Amino acid sequence: MGQTLSRADYAALYGPTTGDRIRLADTELLIEVERDLTIPGEEVRFGGGKVVRDGMGQSQVTREAGAMDTVITGAVVFDHQGITKADVGLRDGRIAGIGKAGNPDTQPGVTLIIGPGTEIIAGEGRILTPGGMDCHIHFICPQQVDHALHSGVTTLLGGGTGPAHGTLATTCTPGPWHIARMLEACAELPVNIGIAGKGNASLPAALEEQVRAGACALKLHEDWGTTPAAIDCCLTVADAMDVQVMIHTDTLNESGFVEDTMAAIAGRTIHAYHTEGAGGGHAPDIIRMVGMGNVLPSSTNPTRPYTGNTIEEHLDMLMVCHHLDRRVPEDVAFAESRIRRETIAAEDILHDLGAFSVISSDSQAMGRIGEVIIRTWQTADKMRRQRGRLAGETGENDNLRARRYIAKYTINPAIAHGISTHVGSIEPGKRADLVLWSPAFFGVKPEMVLVGGRISVAQMGDPNGSIPVQPIFSRPMWGHAGRASALFLSRAGLEAGAGDGLGKALIAVEQTRGIGKADMVLNDAMPQIEVDPETYEVRADGELLTCEPATELPMAQRYFLF
């Protein structure tokens, strides 16, 4: 006999359904469930007296015959595509399907079979997102990995060799020997990793050997000399070998201005790091690159969002990160030329317009690896409060803005670096790198992080408790293992045997060339940017871009009292 439940009672039992709205942490952002792929009255809840029992919601189907390895039940699936209530099935460490789980012998509409070999993760009342991707990593210390993972980031891409001064300043792993050693070091780490080689050279041989050694990208950095000749050489190699190029341009304008850099790039695909300029780049107008169709522009999180403390913090960070000396006037002038409140304020608005496509960290080199997700949503909240609803929103929700911002650290960096076939969204066939959130802690403290379908870290209580009681905090789990994750290599490196013998999944990057701003999901705006060289005021299509610094942010102190 059927029973009618109030919307509130249904949500409390089975999680939100179509039309229900969810507040993200303590922000002003509300997402609304757009569709529900489960069937009312046929929900598969696990537990004593519940549905997932033998002969009820659990079938007799073997794994060989198609039963899932794991089913996440009743979650709100949230990625750039939308917000959907669904069950999610996992097999072989990848997403097998999104739909209705259960027993086809007793239930209608089952698309994901629960069998005796199926594990259940209860997702009712939880939000499920893709694992985040941070594509601006200085590999300074291995302890960064846990800070990223416990924040919900499951893929790291960048360069370095440890706390060498080249790595402290630049995201490059220089040369085949260092690349091989870093691949070995990363084999035991529980996150997906891609290594970037050094791209600063005027002849191709030294770049080609790095790509053959497994580098999945090449990085041009001003501290190594980002000259027009180096830019052209690096992009020529990248086009031939299908790897991405990231660029940190010439702050001092010694070898040319932004126009000269764009001429050297010559319409080819390039990922422009911290395109606002506080992290480095042609002063004061590197931000003009956000309007170029071949440029994939990203931000790093120290300027996200613009607050009353942003300017003061940056000057000290910059002196340390780039090995500068306060006793040298030229070094002080170099630092001050990069920190401009006008362009940082404009960066907030350009993110909200979808002109900046990616947010990353710049880990330990001005940015915080564990705050990519937090600072993305703080930026979204600041813009919601200051600019109101986006023009394209429908209904009483912030779905469009939420989808735009989640794309900045999931699908767009994955597209930019040729790995979107494997990570970046919740779709069948992709790796089961997933993050489960309680809505109250969304973006701040994940409840559970899966890597390759295994629970890697989770909120866990006292291991000696009779039940998992306080103190509860994020701890490594059984899936916190190198074999759960993957290494992303160049195709040339994979064919040359780079990474062989490491006991790790090896995946080649692909289709990194010939893409552009139009491929950046929900973040493909290309306004014409003008920067006043005297006042640093920024205009987009003639409109002045300015906003006040935030004096208070969500997702901050109240979440970190303990």
Curated annotation (Swiss-Prot):
<feature type="binding site">
    <location>
        <position position="136"/>
    </location>
    <ligand>
        <name>Ni(2+) 1</name>
    </ligand>
</feature>
<feature type="domain" description="Urease">
    <location>
        <begin position="131"/>
        <end position="562"/>
    </location>
</feature>
<comment type="subunit">
    <text>Heterotrimer of UreA (gamma), UreB (beta) and UreC (alpha) subunits. Three heterotrimers associate to form the active enzyme.</text>
</comment>
<keyword id="KW-0533">Nickel</keyword>
<dbReference type="InterPro" id="IPR011059">
    <property type="entry name" value="Metal-dep_hydrolase_composite"/>
</dbReference>
<comment type="pathway">
    <text>Nitrogen metabolism; urea degradation; CO(2) and NH(3) from urea (urease route): step 1/1.</text>
</comment>
<feature type="modified residue" description="N6-carboxylysine">
    <location>
        <position position="219"/>
    </location>
</feature>
<comment type="similarity">
    <text>Belongs to the metallo-dependent hydrolases superfamily. Urease alpha subunit family.</text>
</comment>
<dbReference type="InterPro" id="IPR017951">
    <property type="entry name" value="Urease_asu_c"/>
</dbReference>
<dbReference type="InterPro" id="IPR032466">
    <property type="entry name" value="Metal_Hydrolase"/>
</dbReference>
<feature type="binding site" description="via carbamate group">
    <location>
        <position position="219"/>
    </location>
    <ligand>
        <name>Ni(2+) 1</name>
    </ligand>
</feature>
<feature type="binding site">
    <location>
        <position position="274"/>
    </location>
    <ligand>
        <name>Ni(2+) 2</name>
    </ligand>
</feature>
<protein>
    <recommendedName>
        <fullName>Urease subunit alpha</fullName>
        <ecNumber>3.5.1.5</ecNumber>
    </recommendedName>
</protein>
<dbReference type="InterPro" id="IPR017950">
    <property type="entry name" value="Urease_AS"/>
</dbReference>
<feature type="binding site">
    <location>
        <position position="138"/>
    </location>
    <ligand>
        <name>Ni(2+) 1</name>
    </ligand>
</feature>
<keyword id="KW-0963">Cytoplasm</keyword>
<dbReference type="InterPro" id="IPR006680">
    <property type="entry name" value="Amidohydro-rel"/>
</dbReference>
<dbReference type="InterPro" id="IPR011612">
    <property type="entry name" value="Urease_alpha_N_dom"/>
</dbReference>
<dbReference type="GO" id="GO:0005737">
    <property type="term" value="C:cytoplasm"/>
</dbReference>
<keyword id="KW-0479">Metal-binding</keyword>
<keyword id="KW-0378">Hydrolase</keyword>
<feature type="binding site">
    <location>
        <position position="248"/>
    </location>
    <ligand>
        <name>Ni(2+) 2</name>
    </ligand>
</feature>
<feature type="binding site">
    <location>
        <position position="221"/>
    </location>
    <ligand>
        <name>substrate</name>
    </ligand>
</feature>
<dbReference type="InterPro" id="IPR050112">
    <property type="entry name" value="Urease_alpha_subunit"/>
</dbReference>
<dbReference type="Pfam" id="PF00449">
    <property type="entry name" value="Urease_alpha"/>
</dbReference>
<feature type="binding site" description="via carbamate group">
    <location>
        <position position="219"/>
    </location>
    <ligand>
        <name>Ni(2+) 2</name>
    </ligand>
</feature>
<dbReference type="GO" id="GO:0016151">
    <property type="term" value="F:nickel cation binding"/>
</dbReference>
<dbReference type="InterPro" id="IPR005848">
    <property type="entry name" value="Urease_asu"/>
</dbReference>
<dbReference type="Pfam" id="PF01979">
    <property type="entry name" value="Amidohydro_1"/>
</dbReference>
<dbReference type="GO" id="GO:0009039">
    <property type="term" value="F:urease activity"/>
</dbReference>
<dbReference type="GO" id="GO:0043419">
    <property type="term" value="P:urea catabolic process"/>
</dbReference>
<feature type="active site" description="Proton donor">
    <location>
        <position position="322"/>
    </location>
</feature>
<feature type="binding site">
    <location>
        <position position="362"/>
    </location>
    <ligand>
        <name>Ni(2+) 1</name>
    </ligand>
</feature>
